Amino acid sequence: MLYLHDVWVNWFEGEENGYNVCHFYEWRKDDTIELLDQVPLLKVDATLYHYIENELLELPQKLLEDVYHKAYIRKNHERLQQEYCFVVTDGKGIIAIDSIGYNVPIRKSRLIPRQEQMVYEMVENVQAEKYEFQVEEIEKEHHILSPSPFIMNGLTRKERQLKQLLFMALDQLHTTKNPAEIRYWFTEWDPSAYGMVQHMEFEDVWAKLYDEAKTGWSEKHEQLCERLVKGQPFFEKLWEMENEQKVN
C-alpha cells in the first residue's frame, strides 16, 4: 500500500460532478483547508476513477476494506483516524475521497500541484488495482440541475456557480407555466425576439431560452441571472455570496 503524508485538502461535499471539485488554483481564502497526516494512495483503471470522480454511488467493498482506518487527519495538534479516506488516481486524474463513514464518496478534494506531481511519480510504474463494482449500463443523465461537463468546460469557479444559479432560477421559472412571464424573460435575453415569442407556446419559449443560455458564459448571462433572482431571498443570497468573490 502506498501512502502520502501531509496532504492539504479542500473538501467539496456531495458533489456528483467532478467539475465542481475545484483545482488548487480555484481555492478561496474562506475555504476550509484540512491537513491529512497520512492517507493511502490507490491506482485504479480509468473506468473506476471516472466513476468515483463523477458519481455519488457505492464504492467497491474491497476498496473500502483496503483503506479502512489507514488515513489520519491532523486537527488541533491531534491525529484523528478516519474510516474511509484515500487518494485515488488512474495515472492522469487525481482526487482525494472521504466517505465520512458511508460507502459513497461524500467528500472530494483536489491536491496541491506539488503533491499531484508526487502522486504521478509514485504510481508511474505501479499496476492498477482491480476492484469489482457495478457500472450502470445506462449513460449518466445530465439535466438542468446537474449540467453536463460540456456545458461547464472552460468556466471559472465563479462562472460555474452563477451558471448553476441561473439554471436553478430557470428551473423554477419552468414550474410557473406562465406564458406572459417566460415571453418577458426571453425578450430580456434577446430584445429582437419580442415579436417572434408572442406567438410561441410556453414550453417552446422556455426550451429556447434554456438552449441559448446553456452555451458559454457572458455579461448577458450574468445580467439575466441577476434579474431572475431578484426578490427571491434564497437565490439572492447565493448571488451575493458569489459576487463577494473578486476572483475565481
From Swiss-Prot:
Domain of life assignment: Bacteria
Q: Which InterPro entries match?
A: UPF0736
- HAMAP family attached here? UPF0736
* Family designation: Belongs to the UPF0736 family.
What is this protein identified as?
UPF0736 protein BcerKBAB4_1085
Q: Lineage of the native species?
A: Bacteria, Bacillati, Bacillota, Bacilli, Bacillales
